[in-house]
Amino acid sequence: MNSTTKHLLHCTLLITVIVTFEVFSGGIKIDENSFTLVDPWTEYGQLATVLLYLLRFLTLLTLPQVLFNFCGLVFYNAFPEKVVLKGSPLLAPFICIRVVTRGDFPDLVKTNVLRNMNTCLDTGLENFLIEVVTDKAVNLSQHRRIREIVVPKEYKTRTGALFKSRALQYCLEDNVNVLNDSDWIVHLDEETLLTENSVRGIINFVLDGKHPFGQGLITYANENVVNWLTTLADSFRVSDDMGKLRLQFKLFHKPLFSWKGSYVVTQVSAERSVSFDNGIDGSVAEDCFFAMRAFSQGYTFNFIEGEMYEKSPFTLLDFLQQRKRWLQGILLVVHSKMIPFKHKLLLGISVYSWVTMPLSTSNIIFAALYPIPCPNLVDFVCAFIAAINIYMYVFGVIKSFSLYRFGLFRFLACVLGAVCTIPVNVVIENVAVIWGLVGKKHKFYVVQKDVRVLETV
């Protein structure tokens, strides 16, 4: 089955899910039973009715990102063929693969550095270096393609940047940086694994050279799955990459909704110009702050073909902590005076749809207990939003799990399992919102990343 056929089947399934959900939820009115005949003003009272309508309209905050996901998943081939090199890897500019770590998992770092180096060599890439930037020495073996940078404890940036921002800024200092302005940096987390497909995509991106920033797809169900619940929940993020992220970069070439912190490709001159020295507020979600600053300075972005591999958090607590940090960090970005309002408008709408999630999800209960009549368009849009969000989990599994590897029965079980994780994920996201709003904002929680640590405990 070729990629075009797969994409058409995916689009058919998506439309089927939308139409089915619209009909059964009342988004599309097919008979008189689809209409709500209650007069809420007399039935529930004025205050209760106003609150019910406010809760219903809060759902619409997610509409911009839902539309981006829908368009990205439909208008671009969701199952592209293997990436084909558009030029010789020998002609590619110098590439530095930069891994930032605290140094808590040295064995993991050593293993992944070796794997990633071999992946680059297998792809034919010759002009590259792997840099590991760490707070604590991991004692990497000496190799001409590997450089270990230990950030001194006494190092401070001009604005007092912390955590990952501080480490990344240290690498850009004149007495540390060994790269030319025309070189490129591929930013990875310590658990991120390159694939030959992603290396070819990066080579094509840097050979093209039209955009100084780029990012691609990360999947989470590769090799051994540690926690099935968090992995299935993260299938949503896979769809988010293939939908919203891909559309904003391929069509607009702007990080309208920000980007991720790994699989980040930057040109050195642009990265140094934007800088990671963005104070405390820019240190919790440093990737988001960096993208918004680059956006406000007029830099352009593009989507990079080819996927990389990561693992989902190993425990539900880590999953919760991860989401809490993202929420807190993005809120700091949205509220920062350093980012012009027009550049963070869509990001602000997106994060406030997340902040109000405990209120908007209460519609599930209140809509059943206290139905209210709404304009047909509102009912249609609300059902459309719900259908797309459900399908995001389904598509994420289809994209992440191999039918040949798992077999039809286990593959369908994974799809069903992803749908079943939605209530759990909603609960976790709601807890993360509440905890994020009342908890300490300037904290950087690092999740467990080394499987071998779990195996020996």
From Swiss-Prot:
* Bilayer-crossing regions: 8-28, 35-55, 57-77, 346-366, 378-398, 415-435
GO MF annotations for this entry?
A: beta-1,4-mannosyltransferase activity
Give the way it sits in the membrane: Multi-pass membrane protein
Disulfide cross-links: none
Q: Which family does it belong to?
A: Belongs to the glycosyltransferase 2 family.
Q: Which InterPro entries match?
A: B_mannosylTrfase_Bre-3/Egh, Glyco_trans_2-like, Nucleotide-diphossugar_trans
Pfam families annotated for this entry?
A: Glyco_trans_2_3
The main location is membrane
Q: What is its EC number?
A: 2.4.1.-
Q: What does this protein do?
A: Glycosyltransferase with a proposed role in glycosphingolipid biosynthesis. Neurogenic protein implicated in epithelial development. Critical component of a differential oocyte-follicle cell adhesive system.
Q: Which UniProt keywords apply?
A: Developmental protein, Glycosyltransferase, Membrane, Transferase, Transmembrane, Transmembrane helix
GO CC term (a single one) = cytoplasm
Q: Which domain of life is it from?
A: Eukaryota
Q: What is this protein called?
A: Beta-1,4-mannosyltransferase egh
* Single biological process term from Gene Ontology: regulation of egg-laying behavior
Against Gene3D superfamilies, the record matches this protein to:
Spore Coat Polysaccharide Biosynthesis Protein SpsA, Chain A
Record SUPFAM superfamilies? Nucleotide-diphospho-sugar transferases
Indicate yes or no for the key word Zinc-finger. Answer: no
Localization (cell): Membrane
